[in-house]
Amino acid sequence: MDIEIIVGSTLGSAEYVADELEALLKEQHQVKIHLDAEFEELNQQAFWLICSSTHGAGDVPDNLQPFFQHLLENQPDLSSVSYSVVAIGSSSYDTFCGAGKDLDQTLSNLGAKKLKERLEIDVDLEPVPEEPAVAWLESWKNELNVN
């Protein structure tokens, strides 16, 4: 299966998580990481794994803004896309994991099929966010072989 890992990162946490998940997935899949995702470059028949931190007041990080704005403005039909979201944030903010929640809702609204519920990682409780992300993916990654 082809997998597109779409990364939204400000300080690097989401990128580290994406790198760890790529290492797990590339054993059995064709995986591509997008640090500056452009909608036109993404395979819409692939599984999209979104790894995003939250920036500012619950915002999508700057590097993922063009992708997110494209979705909002163009409303593409994503019914052929399956996806899951890893959201990273700090529960000390009332906008905890806001970017991941917004991305998840937007993809769902555009018809994409959620393969697994969103993982929300609280960096206040998980100083190494890669660890819960790897455990989450390990618990269901074999399902990617049958979808």
Language-model-detected regions and their locations in the chain:
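FMN-binding flavodoxin-like domain, especially the glycine-rich phosphate-binding loop
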Residues: 4, 12-16, 24, 28, ...
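A short, well-structured beta->alpha microelement
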Residues: 28-40
